[in-house]
Amino acid sequence: FEGFTVHLLLRYTSGHKDFPDAEMNIKHTLENTARKIPHKEAIILGNRRITYGELDEVSNKVANALLKMGMQKGTHVAILMSHSPEWVINYFGVIKGGGIAVLLNTALKAPELEALLRDSDSEILITERGFSQILSPFISNIPLLKHVITVDTASYTKMIANSSSVSPDIDIKDEDEATIFYTSGVLGKQKGVVHTHASSMGTPPVVSAGIQRKREDVIIDLVPFSYLFGLFEVLFGSIIQGSTVVLIPSFTPRAFLEAVDKEKGTISFGVPAMYNALAMVRDEILERYDLSSLRLVVTAGAKSFPKLMQILEDKFNLSLYEVYGLTEVSAVSISTADSRKLGTVGKPICRLKILDDNGKATAIGEIGEAVFNAPWVMKGYYKAPDLTAQVLKDGWFYTGDLVKMDEEGYLEYIEKKSFIIVTSSGLNIGPSEVEFLLLSHPSVAEVAYVGINDGYGGQIPTAFVVLKDGQHATAEELSNLCYQNLADFKLPKRIEFIDSIPKTSSGKISRKKLKEIDLSQH
């Protein structure tokens, strides 16, 4: 698989004189691009447009202001901000000053934010006035927090105006810690994932090579930068190449279509739920927009439904590429122009083992746990060596994800082990198979198949279904569809019609919230 990665980079970079030298340092990556193309637009939000030169200069001002405030190399600086140019500016300000950025999800509630600010040992918080109400009850009680900087205030504007625009003379090494992401993906509890400068810069050039991102590309970004996929593959990958990134703070199909039309977007990054929504947009609405510039969309973060993705490709006349990865190990498998197969996540770009429950390698076509070895794996979980040891063993990262590989080397993501439904008889059901089947019904828009605890150690397989506008289907009709196509033990015991499937802030199905629904009220 290392050969496939090298092939991608060599094939793409040869003959492309604009491809910058590979950097393993976040600070130097921005500075190199800003030096080469200072007047090229870097970030766009609505009518706000920031060039690479401006991004470099203003982030220097932020860095120097933070250093004057008392930030030192290694200081933890939390960022709680909306998806905006200011987020990018302040993130790079922290990095250039030698700080470690702690990225907080804007969808978190007060108890969650308080817990993460405490756990992360953050000494500075950069935020916006819109978060003051949620922060005010507890912010003065965070023991190590010394400063709260609110960016949309006159005092912040004055602080930046009076700060030097010269890059701080801070010795930042590739192996220095750079960013802490909080995730609950693998072990089911919130924990800080620590990435260094080097681990941050491993996959962006590989993914850029795979999707053939060029300097003239305009990236439509639907993914917040507080997520690794957004920061590494969207922002860092675009900065390395010198592409322009158009931000959409809150996804709606209309916002996406308007951005592509106005900015002549060429590549989009999002999650499957967003592209599912776009696939459902009526043709007469699409005809109002010029979407001819859009050549491909990239998805990650959840399992996509091949049928809907094929509809999307046909409707928009583009290609869909999938990226599979985790916060702890970044991208590990991608689709490319040379290796694309709907229903798969392309081919691995690092070393992979697929292991059965006994730790033995599976045969081709057999399902097992994905275990990866990559140079861009996380440094570890913050202050949690025991948790790190559970998933990182002898350089191999144990994902908890079930996958299988076909005879051509394409990797198919099945689902997380934790999503498996265990019946009262002890049989295991993979939700995606049932979800795919129910989605094939012409009246069904969305499906989530989860196990509701039965009180006896097993689970009640329950399908939550959202119907398309104006369409009708009965539980009996959908049950018959399952009966005709699935083994009896896989059949839903209940089918519940709901108005919408609850999602996480990253657009994934919130199976936890579905399991909390009181079925006695339905």
Regions found by a protein language model. Name each.
Residues 108, 125, 268, 374, ...:
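AMP-binding/adenylate-forming catalytic core of the ANL superfamily
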Residues 201-218, 226-267, 277, 281:
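Conserved AMP-binding/adenylation subdomain of ANL enzymes
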Residues 262-270, 279-342, 351, 359:
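Gly/Ser/Thr-rich phosphate-binding loop
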Residues 353, 364-378, 396, 402-403:
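AMP-binding/adenylate-forming core of the ANL superfamily
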Residues 47, 130-174, 281-282:
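ANL superfamily adenylate-forming
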Residues 51-53, 178-202:
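Conserved AMP-binding A3 loop
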Residues 18-26, 31, 39-84, 88-92, ...:
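Conserved AMP-binding/adenylate-forming core of the ANL superfamily
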Residues 23, 39, 150, 164-182, ...:
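Conserved pre-ATP/AMP-binding loop-to-beta segment of ANL
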